[in-house]
Amino acid sequence: MSKSENLYSAARELLPGGVNSPVRAFTGVGGTPLFIEKADGAYLYDVDGKAYIDYVGSWGPMVLGHNHPAIRNAVIEAAERGLSFGAPTEMEVKMAQLVTELVPTMDMVRMVNSGTEATMSAIRLARGFTGRDKIIKFEGCYHGHADCLLVKAGSGALTLGQPNSPGVPADFAKHTLTCTYNDLASVRAAFEQYPQEIACIIVEPVAGNMNCVPPQPEFLPGLRALCDEFGTLLIIDEVMTGFRVALAGAQDYYGVVPDLTCLGKIIGGGMPVGAFGGRRDVMDALAPTGPVYQAGTLSGNPIAMAAGFACLNEVAQPGVHETLDELTTRLAEGLLEAAEEAGTPLVVNHVGGMFGIFFTDAESVTCYQDVMACDVERFKRFFHMMLDEGVYLAPSAFEAGFMSVAHSMEDINNTIDAARRVFAKL
């Protein structure tokens, strides 16, 4: 047995499923998950000594690559002064100044510890500010594991939400309306049925939890217009897209102004950080200035703030996003060329530094139904064959891939060459 197999066997006796987050267990692709010993730049190194070109990037945060010296040094320096104080620090102020400068729609920001905390708190704030209970989310979009968001669509577009996890009471889910991503008609229908009851829409501007599905040109502007028409807040969940699709996020890339923005992943530089913020009048409703409660023992802790501050300063340097786009575009085009040579039907979506691979005969993938029609079994085989080639992709057909500026063009070309060999055998 390999070291990974031995560790996984031991882990399953101690951790549910042997992991601390479900997708890591390889249940979406089968087999034994890799246990990682270290990472550097664009590479992961497992406990058995094998190196992999990494396109998971810790599920998004590692836009600069692993073990970046600026972030590492910032964490070490901060740790020498203390790990957490439970009191305000100068770095919190500097971090807030930087975030609001980089994302101009955020007049104010509240730091939290995860993307789930950010979305959960933003929704509570929207409900408190508007005095309304219902929210709209989209089928196939994921916004963390808060109860009101673990909801699937009912039997029709306008049915009340149903829990999609045991432990979520139906009374929680009934206030969540699930519409079809990239389908404005379904959203308008929800507003027409509940014109005075919807507090907010929450949306991934690029859906990254049904692989990678960009918005149609009219979709995000249409959501903004509907929110304005019905007095509803628009929450853009940039946990995945923030600082990756563009420096000011997908909202800037697509030219849409939200009322609230949720951030995570890159904002922490690899440390557990989330944030939400937006319009000053809305944020003023948050405790202690307003009645909507939110708190956290480690929110804004000095280690996470130091890591995030160092990361964002590097990400804001000229050329970073041009490099991400160039590398991701080359990878997408190369994969399509290699698939075509082998007669393998493939769609590759990509925006900025994120991409999605779909095995499908369809010409495009634009919504959850398109994603569900893809060949998951073929993806599973592709994943394991690429792993054997030393390429680490997301171990699920429903998760986006992530590029970093640490990837070289040689890494990209080697990945394409590996895919060419794999497509020939699929």
From Swiss-Prot:
The keyword Cell division does not apply. GO terms for molecular function: glutamate-1-semialdehyde 2,1-aminomutase activity; pyridoxal phosphate binding; transaminase activity. Keywords: Cytoplasm, Isomerase, Porphyrin biosynthesis, Pyridoxal phosphate. It holds the Pfam family Aminotran_3. It is found in: Cytoplasm. Its EC number is 5.4.3.8. The modification N6-(pyridoxal phosphate)lysine is found at residue 265. Its main location: cytoplasm. It catalyses: (S)-4-amino-5-oxopentanoate = 5-aminolevulinate. PROSITE patterns: AA_TRANSFER_CLASS_3. One of its GO terms (cellular component) is cytoplasm. It is an enzyme of class 5 (isomerase). Belongs to the class-III pyridoxal-phosphate-dependent aminotransferase family. HemL subfamily. This is Glutamate-1-semialdehyde 2,1-aminomutase. It comes from Shigella boydii serotype 18 (strain CDC 3083-94 / BS512).
